[in-house]
Structure formats: structure tokens, C-alpha cells
Amino acid sequence: MTFPVEKVRADFPILQREVNGLPLAYLDSAASAQKPNQVIDAESAFYRHGYAAVHRGIHTLSAQATESMENVRKQASRFINARSAEELVFVRGTTEGINLVANSWGTENIRAGDNIIISEMEHHANIVPWQMLCERKGAELRVIPLHPDGTLRLETLAALFDDRTRLLAITHVSNVLGTENPLPDMIALARQHGAKVLVDGAQAVMHHAVDVQALDCDFYVFSGHKLYGPTGIGILYIKEALLQEMPPWEGGGSMISTVSLTQGTTWAKAPWRFEAGTPNTGGIIGLGAAIDYVTSLGLDKIGDYEQMLMRYALEQLAQVPDITLYGPAQRLGVIAFNLGKHHAYDVGSFLDNYGIAVRTGHHCAMPLMAWYGVPAMCRASLAMYNTHEEVDRLVAGLTRIHRLLG
């Protein structure tokens, strides 16, 4: 069955607008995806008709808002096939989720002389928290290097592990290269050394189904805004055995059981002890609507359509004069490139004049830029609402830029 891309596009009001007098071609969903009416309407309806502070309220609005919030927790647990909804923590996004693990589990379990393994393709959100933890604890940060094609040099991975390796923190899909890492093999190797595994799933969950039980990872984190949901909300999955042992990393309301000026404070049970303060309930409702939306379309159908579009885009872009494409042939979501010796910002500015939105810069992956020896790249990302015609416009725009700039 043909993927109903035009029907999908009709659900996204922003795709109807023009930029610089031309129809918007939004090729920046890896940075943040646009929102369908179903998400916008769900969050708006909550604020119009159902808003109240959650937890402890005895009045109807509070009870209903709390129930709605907890229903999304259950919904998200089914979305990634967690054993229990109580293994899921609401966070502001992937960055906060990783920092939570670093500051809670990491503070308790990392000692001087231990080591943590990451890769050279990580987003800064999966580098900097571990650098900070290692500096604080006197631990070592080890790095899996890259092959020129943008895949990890997995033949080096076994040598990085030893009996002091405590954590493998790895991206599921690179936000620059689109590389999907072979998580089952990597996780199996980590298990041989007794190491825990954190997976940054920010660039994966919108492209295909994720099963955290099948992966057997200890932590999995993703952001709602890349999944066609609101900003400021995400999900951190923590395997239950670890969750119960982890102390809170922020203090305040909602995460306590009792507070006494003389007897100290006791914590709420997990996951609520990791959710200090008033939550982003509207964002949670919107996230639930986003999960409903992609589930109704079918992640397998979304993935098949996006892969067809990706193959077409790579074939067409390869014909642009003087273009450099980065990353493997088999990839998800993104195409990073440079055009001749022109700075990515200049290329992106020209494309914007043509109504085409791409991301330019280091993409929060400065070590990866350094590996390739470039200050920046352009990145076009393909989502379920993008079309062959938009790919053609990108190719035509780049060809025109090459002709103008030489």
C-alpha cells in the first residue's frame, strides 16, 4: 500500500506556508520535527478544558489531569515495550535524561580508575555529561573511533572494555551521519564485562519501532519534539532493578514522601522521585498524541517510505557537482554534505532563499567535525512528510548554488 504522504502533509499546518515567496521545503526534522494538528489540538484542548496541577489534588480537574499524565506514561511504555510504565521517567528531553543518569547512577557507581565508553559520533549531550562525571570522579572516558564511511570501528571495541568499564553510552542513530549502530552486538559485548548500557535514541524512535526489552539496554532516552511532539518533554527508560537503587538528583516538590526539619527527607518511590516540581503536563499530553499519531500510521510503513525517499535523495544528490556526502550508504533520517569549499552557512543561506530549510553548523558534534577536518556541514533530514519533489528542489538548489559560486 502506498504511504499517504499528501494526507500526512495536510495534518501539518506549517507545511502550507511559504518562505521567501516559495513553498516551504522543511528538511530539518532531525533538529526538531513539525507538529501535526492532532498534537496541537490535544495540547490546546488540555489547556482550554482540562488544565490543573497534578498529584495530590482532590478536585476533579486535578484528578483527571493526573490520570491523563499517567496514561501517557503507560502509552509510552508500550511504545518502546518496557516491562512496566514505572520504568519511565518524564524528562525535558534527551539531554536532561542523560544528565539524570550521569548525576544519579553515575555519581553512585563510578569510581576513580573506572572507565566509560562512548563513540566519536556522539551528540554533545552524550559526551559532555560523561566528561563532567569523569573529571569529578577521576574516571577515564574511552572513545570508539570511526571508519571513513561513518560507521564505527567495531573491531576496536573489545579492546576498549576491561574489568573497570562501568558504562557503554552510545547513540542508536547518529544525528549527523544517519549511521544506525549494531546495538545487539555492542550490548552483548558490554554484558560480557558487566558494564551497563545507555542508548541515546533521539534519532531512532521516529524511524522504526524500538523494543527496550529485546535490546536489553539499561537506559534508553528520547525527546518528544523530534517525534512530532511538543518541546520540553522526553522519556527516560531505566531498567527496574537499577531504577530502585538510584537516588534522586533534584530536590523539591512531588519527589518526596516526607519532609522534616529534624528527621530529614524521605523520597517518593520511583519513577516519581526523579520528577521534582510541577511537570510539563501539557507537553506530556502532546507527546501522547504524537505517539498515537505515528502509531496510527504504522512505524513500519513510515520507515519503508522514508527509506525509499532516502535512496532517491542519495542517488540524486550524488549527481550534484562538487558535493561531498558524509556517512554510510545505509542510513536513517539524515544526509550531511558540503558543497565544494563553500562554508555550510553560505550554502544554507542560499537554500533558505529558495524556501528550503536545512541545518548548518557542527550539529552539536564537534569531535565528529574535527575527525572529518571540517568546521561545519549542511544537513538535510528526511521525515515522513517530505516528498520526492522536495528532494528535487534541494538538488536543483545546490546545482544552482554551484553554478553561481563556482
From Swiss-Prot:
Keywords: Cytoplasm, Lyase, Pyridoxal phosphate, Transferase. This is Cysteine desulfurase. HAMAP family: SufS_aminotrans_5. It catalyses: (sulfur carrier)-H + L-cysteine = (sulfur carrier)-SH + L-alanine; L-selenocysteine + AH2 = hydrogenselenide + L-alanine + A + H(+). Its cofactor is pyridoxal 5'-phosphate. One of its GO terms (cellular component) is cytoplasm. The lineage of its organism: Bacteria, Pseudomonadati, Pseudomonadota, Gammaproteobacteria, Enterobacterales. SUPFAM superfamilies: PLP-dependent transferases. Its EC number is 2.8.1.7, 4.4.1.16. The active site is at 364 (cysteine persulfide intermediate). PANTHER family: CYSTEINE DESULFURASE. GO terms for biological process: cysteine metabolic process.
